[in-house]
């Protein structure tokens, strides 16, 4: 889904730019690189995106996709270097900060990753994505209380962002609040229609929770 949205954004960006042969060529090249990434062909994708940037060094979408290609290829430092340049672009959004934080975290720099997520929230306070990122970092550190607070914040500020409901429900399934787990689980299922693995996980959690409630103590 995110790739579909990005392709639409690329098309819109170029649609409002002056129509030139070079612009059209860049658009085609970026889409070609994305297709290669989806096929797991990171090296040729990186080569194409670097060629675009060689003639258009400020192209946000080319640089973003190059960072993503590096990330998928496991070159997290190079990925972070790309996204560090992008957070100051006018086109930057919460996904830009999310990817920078993720790349830094995967590179082993958790402190900087946390700082990036917080910086992103200052700029995009209604980003469910960034609140979920913070919650997941807290959960990995064993702080389920902070994780829950972050997930609930994500649900509050971004009610259409389904990962907030998913993370909240999954955490509650392992708590002593089964009624809340069922509530957030049902809300997630009502909102999510594409992520089959998460739908299956939440559905199982709901069934197991009902069984535990019905079972004699």
Where are these regions (language model features)?
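Canonical positions in the second alpha-helix
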Residues: 51-52, 85-86, 119-120, 153-154, ...
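Structural marker of alpha-solenoid helical repeat scaffolds
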Residues: 55, 89-90, 123-124, 157, ...
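Helix-start (N-cap) detector for alpha-helical repeat units in TPR-like alpha-solenoids
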Residues: 25-27, 60-61, 93-95, 128-129, ...
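Register position in tetratricopeptide repeats
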Residues: 38-39, 72-73, 106-109, 140-141, ...
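Canonical tetratricopeptide repeat
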Residues: 65-68, 82, 98-99, 133, ...
